[in-house]
Amino acid sequence: MMILVTGGARSGKSRHAEALIGDAPQVLYIATSQILDDEMAARIQHHKDGRPAHWRTAECWRHLDTLITADLAPDDAILLECITTMVTNLLFALGGENDPEQWDYAAMERAIDDEIQILIAACQRCPAKVVLVTNEVGMGIVPENRLARHFRDIAGRVNQRLAAAADEVWLVVSGIGVKIK
């Protein structure tokens, strides 16, 4: 079962996603963040400290089909957090050292879509419950710079693809989860 949990920043998405995992005997938490500064390190540690001790953590943001496999048991669970961070990492990996003003966003989106299609296929083959957390980025103002606009657009389309493929979709607002699919 593939479940998508979306919402704004600090909306309670993580807590809601963790509740959806329930009491699965084996949980793999896939963290897509990269530790780039002390603040991010502290945020990641805060999340780790709040998880049950038996949860395993894998830090990975690419080739997720190597972790989400058909070998898992049906009562196991995977929590992947977060899709928008994965999209950010992919954008910057694809852009390399080039100026973001010169990036070919259409080609980058195709490459990101390929990665998302592989992720969806892995989730659909996996017998375990897979909960994906993402940020709802399309409810705010139009960003003023090109990179931010393209990120918002790409992340929004990624979320649409994931929602279409998911068995359930939850929107979390102010700590309250609303099932929308």
Curated annotation (Swiss-Prot):
* Thermal activity characteristics from the UniProt entry: Optimum temperature is 37 degrees Celsius.
What lineage is this protein's organism placed in?
A: Bacteria, Pseudomonadati, Pseudomonadota, Gammaproteobacteria, Enterobacterales
Family named by the database record = Belongs to the CobU/CobP family.
Q: Name one GO molecular function term.
A: ATP binding
Q: How does activity depend on pH?
A: Optimum pH is 8.8-9.0.
Cystine crosslinks: none
Q: Tell me which residues bind GTP.
A: 7-14, 31-33, 48-51, 59, 81
- In which organism is this protein found? Salmonella typhimurium (strain LT2 / SGSC1412 / ATCC 700720)
Listed under GO biological process in this entry are: cobalamin biosynthetic process
Transferase among the record's keywords? yes
**Gene of origin?**
cobU
Q: What is this protein called?
A: Bifunctional adenosylcobalamin biosynthesis protein CobU
At the top level of its lineage, which domain of life is listed? Bacteria
